[in-house]
Amino acid sequence: FNKSIIIRKYIDTKAANSIIKKINTSGEKMLQIGQIAEVRITDVNHMGKGVGKINDFVVFIDNTISGDYVQIQIFDIKKNYAEGKLIKIIEKSTDRIESPCSFYHQCGGCQLMHMSYEQQLIYKKNRVINELRRAGVNLEGINIYDTIGMDTPFRYRNKTAFFTAQKDKTIIMGPYEQGTYNTVNISNCLLQSEAADKAFGVIRKAIAKYNIAAYDKKTGNGF
């Protein structure tokens, strides 16, 4: 290898083939697509993904937070980082909670609902500090105040974006699945108001009653 070799891979996820994509950055250690590994999560990045390392190579993993010790499977490798899918949590972070949303692990609308709200506020403050430093701002002598939280961190959004799709001759409605354009069929959202939930239900019934077609990205037709 020179500095690295990247083999472009096209996967049929149902086939679970074993095409391998490798990268060599140290001349000694390599990762492979499909590789199983155990990782300690030490940080959370700006996308809400947990950050860990395998042989000093950075790996990002969804649905993990600082303090988690997890088993993952590598599914993508770039020049400077890899991405892994969470298989199981071996040791939970003390800041990890069970999400109150039954759609959370499918929906792409939220990234931190498995993190305690107190820790979310700390994460947001640290993100501001990190972004300012990354932009070259000298923070010496500057006090960054703590994030001001809410008494109840739910039902606060006045705008949400939901999409329609055709599935088994039925129209489904909801947000996109995380990292895809696949619509997740939901009945409510804990971030929007209860009035918005009711309006969502009315629209769903109207679509079914009047046999309105789901939006088709190719033709531009539908709702």
Q: What are these regions, as identified by a protein language model?
A:
Residues 5-13, 19-24:
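Short, positively charged and aromatic/hydrophobic N-terminal segments
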Residues 18, 23-223:
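Accessory RNA-recognition modules of RNA-modification enzymes
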